[in-house]
């Protein structure tokens, strides 16, 4: 966005019209508190906020509206770019997000922002320019939709009708080659049969690219709510909770044992892969605007955190009153406490362990980050060894990556 465009922005925003799947839904305002008031018979903005005659008042902005706001790097970048022209707070970020945020909620405060030129995925993956690519993408796309999280990332528009929008992530000095780390973990998840979006890793290892999954096959956006929102918690409480409650929320909202089992599979995968950052915002449910077909969203934001010395060697949430990574037996006991049979849970854990080991054995990128492969393998061995069970890793030579 040019300086002239920035000069036309209002200094402050206190009223934002909220839409669900392009249908006017209500008005969000700020005075001494935040207030959201539905229009008559409008679709609900959240599974936790049914349409009601009176307003939803809150001292802080409602979780469903804050869940996709940028954190850390991107938020600081936006604030710095606009600081001479606007007071960038949560309401302002919603207005800037417009219709390009994750999920089917969109926001209108009358801002007119220019469209950014699209970029082909191939140009990102095979970048060979002298200057670093990510700063250029950030400059072009920092207002092109937003995604939560502290990792440097930007939403990039697809260059063709067949190419969906993607999220491009980089890394900083604290977490070197986090791009490789996440790519490897996501490929392991795919190998294990979890529902994953398409992902890519650039030739120079500087960029991890993931396809957006917040639209159905017809291109209609779906609702997406992370578990902090579903539990009525602000994002800064994303590490407060238990995996037991994660599964309870799934059961309550889907009334489906299959979805509960799928969520257990994802929780168990995070434990086996050594992801200590599987917090409430890294799980979500998705659904249509009429709140039908509620199901677990595809896997996202999975990394092997144990390899980084600045991150505690423990889980993000508690399981059975502890944040220590569980053993196989403890995972099975956890599943049983949530209504899943021990035999089903045991098979899930064993199959995941086999899948992770087999994927690491054949995925070339697992060797692109020094120590990553051995660290994951060591953690996996420790989890399974605690129960004196050695998984038999079957290697399917027919299964390959493309």
Regions found by a protein language model. Give the residues of each.
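Phosphate/dinucleotide-binding and metal-coordinating scaffold of catalytic cores
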Residues: 1-280, 284-402
């Amino acid at each position: 966005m040019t300086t002239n465009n920035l000069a036309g922005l209002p200094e402050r925003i206190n009223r934002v019209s909220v839409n669900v799947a392009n249908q006017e839904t209500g008005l969000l305002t700020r005075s001494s508190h935040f207030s959201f008031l539905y229009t008559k018979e409008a679709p609900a903005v959240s599974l936790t906020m049914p349409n009601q005659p009176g307003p939803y008042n809150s001292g802080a902005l409602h979780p469903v509206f804050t869940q996709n706001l940028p954190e850390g790097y991107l938020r600081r970048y936006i604030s710095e770019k606009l600081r001479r022209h606007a007071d960038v707070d949560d309401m302002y970020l919603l207005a800037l997000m417009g219709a390009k945020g994750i999920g089917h909620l969109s926001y209108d405060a009358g801002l007119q922002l220019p469209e950014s030129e699209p970029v082909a995925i191939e140009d990102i993956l095979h970048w060979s320019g002298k200057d670093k690519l990510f700063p250029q993408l950030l400059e072009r796309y920092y207002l092109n939709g937003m995604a939560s999280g502290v990792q440097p990332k930007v939403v990039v528009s697809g260059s063709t009708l067949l190419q969906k929008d993607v999220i491009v992530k980089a890394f900083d000095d604290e977490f070197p080659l986090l791009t490789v780390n996440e790519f490897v973990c996501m490929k392991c998840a795919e190998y294990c049969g979890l529902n994953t979006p398409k992902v890519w890793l650039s030739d120079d290892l500087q960029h991890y690219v993931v396809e957006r999954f917040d639209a159905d096959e017809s291109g209609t956006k779906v609702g997406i709510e992370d578990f902090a929102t579903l539990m009525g918690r602000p994002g800064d409480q994303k590490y407060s909770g238990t995996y037991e409650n994660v599964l309870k929320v799934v059961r309550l909202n889907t009334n489906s044992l299959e979805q509960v089992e799928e969520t257990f599979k994802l929780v168990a995968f995070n434990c086996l892969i050594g992801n200590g950052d599987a917090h409430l915002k890294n799980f979500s449910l998705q659904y249509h605007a009429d709140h039908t077909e509620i199901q677990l969203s595809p896997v996202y934001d999975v990394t092997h955190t144990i390899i980084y010395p600045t991150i505690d060697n423990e889980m993000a949430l508690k399981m059975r009153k502890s944040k220590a990574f569980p053993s196989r037996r403890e995972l099975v006991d956890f599943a049983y406490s949530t209504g899943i049979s021990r035999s089903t849970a045991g098979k899930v854990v064993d199959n995941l362990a086999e899948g992770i080991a087999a994927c690491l054995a054949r995925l070339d990128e697992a060797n692109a980050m020094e120590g990553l492969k051995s660290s994951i393998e060591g953690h996996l061995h420790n989890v399974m060894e605690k129960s004196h069970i050695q998984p038999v890793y079957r290697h399917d030579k027919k299964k390959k990556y493309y």
